[in-house]
Structures are given as structure tokens and as C-alpha cells.
Amino acid sequence: MNRNQNLREFLPQDGFAGTLIGRAWIPTAVSGKTAGPSPVWLTESGVLELSSIAPTCAELLDNGFSTKGVDASKLANVGSYDAIMANTLASKRDANLPYFLSPVDLQAIKACGVTFVVSMIERVIEERAAGDAKKADEIRDKIKTRIGADISSIQPGSLQAEELKNALKAEGLWSQYLEVGIGPYAEVFTKAPVLSSVGPGAEVGILAISSWNNPEPETVLLVDSRAKVVGATLGNDVNLRDIEGRSALLLGKAKDNNASCAIGPFI
């Protein structure tokens, strides 16, 4: 950890004013029980263990957790936010102290692709460049000149989108990425297996064979089993542009790798 790093920068601008749910590893030395992960509630006075209410974040959110009616004095305080975050970010964590984990545990982890005009065009560029970063600038200029202005005002799935699709096909510029960008169906894929996401302080995984990649900041929505959005956090989708650019069928190889899904710090 950078000694000058402000630990409070990992909190929302309003600090602890809202309801902040996280997940932490609680060692036996602190809990007096078998060491393990637990949902936690972050407050100004301390980080409160919620395992007595629900054993996982998935169950906690699915049950519609609310701080109203919860007697905080009956919950175990496992330490201050600052102390736990400092241990989370430490180059060598103290195993006898708690540290934060990804707040996502048993939920399925899905991702949506080609959600913005810019990202859609970039996917087309990757496909045309076949994973070659040197060709990307030339192709980017060509595509933006030809279709950039038209795409931005198109309503996906509309008659106008269908007309544009036909025009692009005629010009040899049609792409599977434009299909999901302006077509009626969104791209939704499984990003990572259950319990595989990493949280604050962890290093993300980059496939060793990739030489053209970048972080991909995302808004992460927490959705219960009734399809209701119950919370939000941040994520890094970790994009291997040279791998996916070779073929969309390599999406799994580009996206689903060890520690390639970073989520957090808190819901």
C-alpha cells in the first residue's frame, strides 16, 4: 500500500451516510469461531458482522436487507474501517486481522457488452484489426468517418437501425458488434464463475499471451432473484483486445481468466 494513500477514497463521497455492505474475511482471532468470509455493514463506529442475519451477501441482498429495525449493538464489531482497509491494501496482510473481499459471492456474474457507441465502434475496430494494434488507428479513422455520426442517434432495434444495417452491409462494413449495438438484442455473457471475483487490494489477472489489453471500468448492479436491482458497486472487466479481436468466439478466453473480474469495494 502507498503510505500516503487516503483510505477514505474507497468510500462514497458521503462517507458512511448511505447503507454500505461489504464482505470480509474474519479470522478466528477476531470472531472466536472458524475463520471465514462474512457479509459486513460499514458504519462510522466500526465494521459490523452480518453472518447472524445471512451467511452470504447473495442471501442478504435477496432477503431485502435493511438497516431499519436492526440493533447494531447486537452485531459483532470486527474492527474499524480504516484498520481493515489498511490490512486489505497491505503488501503483506496480517492473517490474524480482518480484510475486505469482493462483495459478490454466490451470485452469477454476468456482463453486458457493446453498451455505448464508442465501445461498439472499438469492438468493430478490434475485429477488423484481427488483434493487431498497429492497424487500429487507420481502421478507427475510416469507420468513424463513414458511420460514426449516423450511429450515435440510432435507436437500437428501430426501423432506422434496420435501414442503417442494410446500408452498412452494402458497404461491406457490417459487423457482429454492430448487430448487438443497434440490433434488438443486447450482448449478455457470463463474465466469471461463482466465487471467483477479486476485491480491493487484489491484483487482477491478465492472460500472459495478451499484449494489447486495458482495464474496463464498469458499473456493477446487484440484482436479486426477482430481477430487482438492490445495490450497485464498481468493477473492472479486464479487456484483452488482441484476443477478442481475433474472433468473437474467443470471448471466453479473453474475459474469463483467473482474477480477471474485479468487483468492489462495497455495495
Language-model features: locations:
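Active-site microenvironments in enzyme catalytic cores
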Residues: 2-26, 42, 69-267
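Short, solvent-exposed loop/turn segments that connect beta-strands within catalytic domains
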Residues: 29-36, 228
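N-terminal cap/recognition module
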Residues: 35-78
